[in-house]
């Protein structure tokens, strides 16, 4: 079941869902708006192949900055953080969706990483890309996406109980940590 406005408000006010900072004006009929943070990371152009299993290729060749705005150029891919940190209980999951007004500027908010497991805590890393033909300036603090909450049965092993929870309590845009996975044949 998707939570509606009064259910989202109730669960936040009772501390069942954590949103920090919380602004009740961001509650929508079926979601809560989330805002762009001010930490950004991106890969510099180059020919070195990124191998998800090799840490140095994943973490090398990057730049990062903290700024009040960033210009996304056509085709540019940037990791960004949400201003809000969230905390989910073991029976609520969330998905992140881009706001249509941002999408109409050609900005994709996430590539495929839009699912947030029960038990997750931290800021959300956004996988932003500009598919417009023109550069677009994005400002820290602007509403950029929406979190939709779904109730589920209680997870036996929520994200915060997993030994390999790579992104638990992240508080800035975080590069892939796929290299921490065991390689499977």
Swiss-Prot record:
Function of the molecule? Bifunctional enzyme that catalyzes both the deamination of dCTP to dUTP and the hydrolysis of dUTP to dUMP without releasing the toxic dUTP intermediate.
Q: Which GO terms describe its biological process?
A: dUMP biosynthetic process; dUTP biosynthetic process
Q: Where is this site: Important for bifunctional activity?
A: 114-115
The protein's assembly and partners: Homotrimer.
Q: Which NCBIfam families match?
A: dCTP_deam
Which gene produces this protein? dcd
Q: Which UniProt keywords apply?
A: Hydrolase, Nucleotide metabolism, Nucleotide-binding
Q: Does the keyword Nucleotide-binding apply?
A: yes
Name of this protein: dCTP deaminase, dUMP-forming
Indicate the residues that form the catalytic site: 127
Q: Where does dCTP bind?
A: 99-104, 117, 125-127, 146, 159, 166, 170
